[in-house]
Design a protein with these regions (language model features):
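Terminal, non-globular segments
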Residues: 1-434
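Extracellular carbohydrate-recognition regions
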Residues: 427-461, 582
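Extra-cytoplasmic beta-strand recognition segments
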Residues: 443-445, 483-513, 542-552, 582
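Short carbohydrate-recognition loop motifs
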Residues: 455-477
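Secreted extracellular polysaccharide-interacting domains
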Residues: 471-497, 521-531
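Extracellular carbohydrate recognition and processing domains
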Residues: 523-558, 574
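Short beta-strand-plus-loop segments that form exposed binding edges in beta-rich domains
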Residues: 566-574
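Exposed low-complexity, polar/acidic, P/S/T/G-rich flexible segments that act as propeptides
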Residues: 574-582
């Protein structure tokens, strides 16, 4: 989204039409890469620096609000947990927003808790405006901070504070038309599921790296500070500050969660990075003093446990460095260097060219990005591939099945953070490990595996070929089979592929292969594939594919007790359809 000749095209095509985020980081990267180029380390450098400085600023705020102990403990968590480390290594508007909002809060705090100097207010306005251009949730957080200030401000300071708020709004005005344009196109709800009732608890687990050891160290640290500190008061003059921290941490979650449930799913863990440091400041504020030696031991323990769980429990440095596009092209251009390969992906063409230059090898490819290709066109494209090996990334399940129908031997599979890369071969290769799918049901209407619905009245036996066919002649419902989903995918994770060999003897008509998940006689998931969409030729046997991603179908529900998966053929127009195999 940076490959534009001028600023106007960047805003129009890279931001207003190509993104849902404010323009700030796009503009930063546009000019930054024009100066330093597109080396990966240089592109990420501003974000790495932002993450490092955020550690320091979080310490300054904790010290300003409470004391150095609170600041150091907060900084220790910002420095050592996956949440903050991850987004310091990604060129996205999260760690920049973290730094900007921390600086905003720092100067806001100096204005309220120290001398009311105009320079603090000016810098608060500047960083608030920057937050509004960085991310919609950093804008939301800036608004929450600003409103909280109205309840703290003294009468004599109301006018300059209100004027500062007006200045922030004025500085955001140039971006309003971009925001409205993005809003009119809808959000990310087309691919992001609504949050579940477990969202908050899962988020807390994410912060503490899903580690019981990290939780135990946190609890032990809080208990130790309370017991060892000189004194503890929940109702001293710091009470007001603690309530502010509670609001700052919880309100963005509550607003994002409510909006995602009632209007459009938007909330993700990444968006909450701007408010998370204040959770640590709150937790580590209930004390007055602690010896330097004890504090050093506590901080050392926090860092040690967080680093060990990050490296070994989370296996962070194994999975994070296997990024989607890089892994795709490593598999295609390095691992399969000796093969004649073809790449099918969903990359912006620039990515392909970038990695061709990086690995000094070029391969023919097809990208779905901006191609607007339907399933029939995709099938025709695959059938025309001349190479012997195909490497794929970011394909739908039905598309993968089409590829495998022409390249039946799966010789490679690599997965990681947000990616799956498959390698298929047209012929069985010597010394290659063939990855086979598990067959759970099949019928050719003579021999079958699984509990299929009885369609004996539709079966026609051909004595010359010793084969049977299911002939739907005026029938609306054809063969079907049901599975106890808890037996197939007890943890709610799995991919089910269905393949149908079918022929239209008279005319092509609308019929479907259908999958549904049923709970208590109610359909909670439904998916169908129009057989006609596979570009049929009358009187010719062809294959139709349907794929069910159980995790996606259940929207990350982790239990499948009481769920039934049903797959069936629906002949909506009740025309003649012959089925040879399922």
């Amino acid at each position: 989204r940076l490959q534009f000749d001028n600023f106007n095209d960047l805003i129009l095509n890279g931001v207003m039409l190509g993104d849902t985020h404010p323009a700030g980081i796009q503009v930063l990267l546009y000019y930054w890469t024009s100066i330093v180029g597109t080396s990966e380390i240089l592109v990420k450098l501003p974000f790495i620096i932002s993450g490092i400085i955020s550690i320091w600023v979080s310490y300054l705020i904790g010290k300003l609000w409470f004391d150095g102990t609170t600041g150091l403990l907060t900084a220790a968590y910002v420095a050592s947990t996956q949440f903050f480390i991850l987004y310091s290594q990604i060129a996205r508007p999260y760690v920049t927003g973290l730094l900007i909002t921390l600086l905003m809060v720092y100067f806001w705090s100096l204005f309220f808790f120290q001398k009311k100097r105009k320079v603090y207010l000016i810098l608060y306005v500047l960083f608030s405006a920057m937050a509004s251009y960085n991310h919609h949730f950093s804008l939301l957080f800036a608004a929450i901070v600003g409103v909280c200030g109205l309840f703290l401000i003294k009468k004599k300071d109301i006018l300059p504070y209100v004027v500062s708020g007006i200045m922030i709004i004025i500085l955001y005005v140039p971006h309003v038309h971009i925001f409205l344009s993005q809003l009119s196109q809808g959000g990310i709800g087309s691919w992001l599921a609504k949050p579940t009732s477990y969202f908050f608890f899962n988020f807390l687990n994410w912060i503490f790296q899903f580690s019981i050891w990290a939780w135990l160290v946190l609890i032990a640290t809080i208990a130790y500070l309370i017991l060892v500190g000189d004194k503890l008061s929940f109702f001293n003059k710091q009470k007001q500050k603690r309530w502010i921290l509670v609001i700052w941490f919880l309100l963005p979650i509550a607003i994002g969660f409510t909006y995602s449930i009632l209007i459009n799913p938007v909330i993700q863990y990444s968006m909450l990075i701007f408010s998370t440091p204040y959770l640590f400041m709150l937790l580590f504020s209930f004390h007055t003093s602690i010896s330097k030696m004890h504090l050093t031991i506590v901080i050392g323990l926090i860092l040690l446990v967080n680093i060990i769980t990050l490296i070994y429990e989370r296996d962070y440095y194994t999975y994070f460095y296997k990024q989607p596009y890089q892994e795709l092209f490593k598999v295609a251009l390095v691992d399969n260097k000796a093969n004649d390969i073809f790449i099918i992906d969903d990359c912006i063409p620039y990515y392909n060219e970038y990695y061709f230059d990086k690995y000094e090898k070029v391969a023919p490819y097809f990208t779905k990005r901006n191609s607007d290709i339907d399933i029939s066109g995709f099938k025709n494209m695959v059938s025309s591939i001349e190479q012997d090996v195909v490497v794929t990334h970011a394909l739908a399940g039905e598309e993968l099945q089409i590829v495998q129908s022409y390249f039946p031997y799966q010789i490679g599979y690599r997965y990681g953070f947000t990616h799956e890369v498959y390698t298929f071969s047209r012929a069985k290769q010597k010394d290659s490990i063939i990855i086979n799918r598990q067959l759970i049901a099949q019928t050719n209407f003579k021999n079958e595996r699984g509990m299929w619905k009885d369609v004996s009245r539709m079966i026609n036996y051909d004595s010359t070929t010793c084969s049977s066919q299911c002939r739907m002649q005026g029938d609306e419902w054809g063969p079907s089979i049901s599975f106890d989903l808890n037996e197939l995918a007890p943890d709610g994770i799995g991919i089910i592929d269905a393949e149908l060999e079918v022929l239209f003897p008279d005319s092509i008509s609308t019929a479907f292969i259908v999958a549904s998940i049923i709970e208590d006689n109610e359909t909670i998931y439904y998916k169908s594939v129009n057989i006609e969409s596979f570009n049929f030729t009358k009187g010719t046997w062809q294959n139709v594919f349907l794929t069910i991603d159980i995790q996606g179908a259940l929207k990350s529900r982790t239990t499948t007790n009481g769920l039934t998966l049903k797959i069936n053929v629906w002949n909506r127009n009740k025309t003649n359809i012959f089925i040879n195999n399922i």
